[in-house]
Amino acid sequence: MRKLHCALFLILIAAPAVAQTPPSPASGRAEIGAFNRAFDEATRRMDNAASLALWEEDGTSLLPSTKPIVGKKAIAAFLEKVTAQLQGAHMEKFEDMCFDIQVSGNWASEWCVEHQIVQLPAGKPPFDGWGKMLLVLHRGADGKWRLKQEMWNQALPPEP
């Protein structure tokens, strides 16, 4: 009986360490590549639900000339407001390149340069913008990487 208790005790101690083994940096980078593809696709489709699914519940978005947008509900409200203001617009082009992916356990960061062209309704000229993003990602208990924090600012187009 004592051996059984010792064995159960050892299993209980070891189980959390085994269950929460963080990904290796190489596998983490591959998983973040998959996250980036989902992020790109959601942005191209201007799909608020798909974009929101990539956020942590307590995520924070830091955009230029705005107060911090804290929490998934606030981020959803912001996305809905922007979508309403852009009624009839569609993404003509979205591309980005991400660099310097750093993985440490269940946390990661990367920075990206993005370019988007949005066709606006009513004959308005298209929006043609460049930006830089710094992303902090967290890998949840379900194994999915999500945005914990984002900071975005304008960028200059690359020189020809």
Model-derived regions: residue spans:
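A solvent-exposed, acidic/Ser-Thr-rich amphipathic alpha-helical stretch
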Residues: 26-33, 48-106, 113, 125-129
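A short, structured loop/turn motif at beta-sheet edges
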Residues: 101-109, 124, 137-145
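N-terminal secretory signal peptides that target proteins for export/translocation
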Residues: 1-2
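Short beta-strand edge/turn micro-motifs at domain boundaries
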Residues: 130-158
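Boundary at the C-terminal end of the N-terminal hydrophobic targeting segment
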Residues: 17-19
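Bacterial N-terminal signal peptides
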Residues: 5-15
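Beta-strand elements of well-folded, non-transmembrane domains
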Residues: 116-120
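Short helix-adjacent coil turns
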Residues: 39, 46-47
